[in-house]
Amino acid sequence: FMAMAQFQLIDGDSKQQSNSVYNLPTGSIQSPTADGLISGMSTGAGQWRSIYMTFSAHYAFKSRYIADFSVRRDGTTKFGDNKRWGTFPALSFRWNVVDEPWMKGAQKWLSMLSVRPGWGRVGSQPGAEYLFFSKYTATDSYNGANSIYPSNIRLSNLQWEEKETWNVGFDLGLFDNRVTADFNIYTQMTSKLLMTNVNIPSSSGFPSLSWTNVGKMRNNGWEFNINGTDVVKVGKFRLGFNVTFANNKNEIVEMEPTALANLNKDFDNNNGSYLTRVQLNNPFGAIYGFRYKGVYQYSDYSEVEVPGVSGPN
């Protein structure tokens, strides 16, 4: 049995500055001290902190039955006070079938055979700071006088995006692991999907939300890998191989209507490009196009007779 605890505190900050200048002798000048007329200047700064604590435990019985458990507690200043913390556990098991007493007869050629089910949850956070604050912008464009106006909607209910995964895996090794293979089946549900720049009704006074939780998405699939090491050995020549097969099915389970409208633009795609749509119960970004019915034949319409228009007179 083994247990371990970890703790980490992360402090991040960002700063930016921009100048707009005109009447420069050439457009290749980039120095902010160059002789020119300044039309605008802006600065910005951001700061955020995150903290996480983890606890993990590992237990093995006779090297045949193995269990792992972990839990992670995350907190970040990118969310409001009531949504700042997230808890993300994980649990997995492993049964080394090849080490069972009744498998001794096969151990001469079977070096590994195991089954490993697992479950876990992880979280994602937005890539911006101060989303839960009301911010204001100073301007002098109101009747020539200085003024202040709100520049964002306070996102106090923004939450962690969560991905919950169930999986079952199988491992196989042959001839002292010269040939190995693994097969995994999984299902993953992503809830509270984070999306940026989602358009909202103009009656709110703002064109869009910088970040919001919009819905759920499911992924089901499988993956098969097979590897060979030194399968062919001739002198100093060695030959191995690595082959992978995989299949994934994606489905939008839930999504806010405003997010769907934001993702699905007008049917105005350019010639030669694909039109993609996001719809409930369909894959994310499904490609739309004409259905193929075969090669067009001239005789498909040349032999059709229309009374009074074509055919014998």
Language model features: what each stretch is:
Residues 1-280, 285-287, 291:
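Extracellular/periplasmic, surface-exposed regions of secreted and cell-surface proteins
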